[in-house]
């Protein structure tokens, strides 16, 4: 469960840093939000703080801290703009790696992370 939370955090961090190709709106900086992490039949609430740092014209590195009632997780990763307001990439927490899909709209991001262990869905807002 913690790996999924970490992966989600990482994804969110990467997306916030990237610049939208079409709208040229920067998502770089700090974001905060919440959502759910699912692993099998277990579903937990998660809260995340994400920081995006631009690494190239269309990509960013992310660093995140996410918490659930079961613990605190640090997540890192990378995301790339794949067109318009959509981003994809990977995040890592501990030994777990996940795939990130993010949609950016104004001051909000919808992030989905999937891994062999489960998935996470988080909504982030600019801090």
Over which residues does each language-model region extend?
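Signal peptide processing junction and immediate N-terminal pro/mature segment
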Residues: 21-22
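Central antiparallel beta-sheet cores of small beta-barrel/beta-sandwich binding domains
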Residues: 25-127
């Amino acid at each position: 469960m913690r790996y999924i939370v970490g992966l989600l955090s990482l994804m969110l961090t990467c997306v916030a840093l990237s610049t939208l190709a079409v709208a040229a709106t920067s998502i770089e900086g700090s974001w905060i939000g919440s959502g759910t992490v699912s692993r099998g039949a277990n579903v937990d609430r998660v809260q995340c703080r994400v920081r995006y740092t631009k690494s190239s014209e269309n990509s960013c590195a992310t660093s995140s801290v996410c918490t659930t009632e079961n613990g605190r997780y640090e997540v890192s990763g990378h995301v790339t703009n794949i067109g318009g307001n959509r981003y994809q990439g990977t995040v890592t927490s501990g030994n777990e790696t996940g795939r990130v899909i993010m949609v950016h709209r104004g001051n909000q991001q919808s992030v989905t992370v999937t891994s062999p262990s489960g998935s996470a869905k988080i909504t982030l807002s600019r801090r």
